[in-house]
Amino acid sequence: MAEAKQIQALEQERIPRLLFNYAVPAVVGTVVNSLYNIVDRIFIGQGVSEYALSGLAITFPILLFLQAFGMLVGAGASVRVSILLGQRNTPRAEQTLANAVYLTLVTQILTIIPCYIYMEPLLRLFGASDRTLPYAMEYLQIVIPANFFAAFSFGYNAIMRASGYPRKAMTTMLLSALINVVLDYIFIYPLGMGIRGAAIATAIAMVICAVYVLAHFFLPGSVVRFRRAAFRPSWAIVRAITAIGIAPFAMQLTGSAVNVLMNRSFVAYGTTPEESDLAIGAFGIISSYAMLIVMLILGVAQGMQPIVGFNYGARHMHRVRMAYAYSAGTNLFFSFVGFAVAMLYPRAIVSLFTTSEPLIALCTTALRIGIMGVSLIGFQITTTQLFQSIGFSRLAIFLSLTRQLIFLAPALLILPRFLGLDGVWWSLPVSDMAAVGVAVVLIISRWKLLEGTEAKAADALPEE
């Protein structure tokens, strides 16, 4: 009965109402998920020091790298599950759920162990100085192993949402974030545990979230759940998961590479070692604010995903078009609001993270520059998610790479040569706006597919 109700809503509910029902929990979930890192940065910047904040920023490339593999499995499996449910193929959806467990185990073991062993040389490579390295090491020694649980919590939270439980997925993230915030405060202030306390708080929250999410798929009433018969390894299913998940994986992986490029640029173009360390901390603050906006946008796009995936699988192309149009419009609004707030109140935003006047002065100027491209980025992210949701992974990968690598890397190589440290900041809006332009061209060129007859459009559905 519950399964029929979820399926009927995806197929027949009015799109604005359906998108609201899916997007609100997804937005809360993604924004709350971003609070893992943001809350750590606020408590560390305010409760430890500005160099501890910079040390935390140095860890981003490693953490983004590890999270990329969770996104590979979670995003890929969730899209496949929603499409298969649209095709009324629940047994195959449950086999996809089971194979995602194997894939998560393998990817996490193969990535966590090397990152832990080579932690110090990696941090040095990523721009750590003698002032920031001890803080970065202390944090990662706890958080790297905990990312094993984060991969399951993120991946299966996405599948939970895609299979018709957006509110429960939201509750999971709220619970986890609340635990993280409370423990952050207790460990850093009353107990005086510093950055190590923040790491322990994050690790505990990750473990609890993973247990809660996985427990859902053992419940008899779940639309898809773990069944012993479904745990048959299938290379076809693994390929289908990775083919779709490769787009967000590439986006996250290039995000890691971008962080490395940015940090190395700060080291190269800072006038003193102290300025370089502060610039890395400033980038951490700017990334935190930008992450909040992007996660808000991504939440709407993720709310769109099961609607688009199901209706694409069910050959209801008019509903696919409507879901995309409403999502893109909503995200453009969020983009502009985030941009406007940063332009009007940059110092207030920066002061949330630090009381250091040199860091506040540097970051206030940098924030106004770096956030300019965010004004239209909601359209680019929504378009990327559309292509990912209907299985067009190559287009989604290309769009992901345009924003974070294809345009940003050349900008980082060229602009700082003429503008110095300011050129590093200007590379961010230049690459964002160029990526938006590419997204406009691609959606116009592919719109005929979504305007075609229901049967013809569905024939383009990628197979396992």
Label for each model-derived stretch:
Residues 31-35, 75-77, 108-116, 151-155, ...:
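Hydrophobic positions within alpha-helical transmembrane segments of bacterial inner-membrane proteins
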Residues 21-40, 142, 176, 205-209, ...:
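Transmembrane helical elements of multi-pass membrane transporters/channels
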Residues 53-113, 150-169, 263, 282-340, ...:
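Small-residue-rich hydrophobic transmembrane alpha-helices
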Residues 35-53, 123-130, 186-193, 253-286, ...:
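Helix-terminus/linker motif at the lipid-water interface of multi-pass membrane proteins
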Residues 1-23, 81-148, 179, 190-246, ...:
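Short alpha-helical transmembrane segments in multi-pass integral membrane proteins
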Residues 74, 143-161, 169-177, 198-213, ...:
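Short runs within selected transmembrane alpha-helices of multi-pass transporters and secretion channels
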Residues 16-35, 39, 62-69, 106, ...:
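Residue-level signal for short hydrophobic patches within transmembrane helices
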Residues 26, 30, 42, 79, ...:
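Transmembrane alpha-helix boundary and packing residues in multipass membrane permease domains
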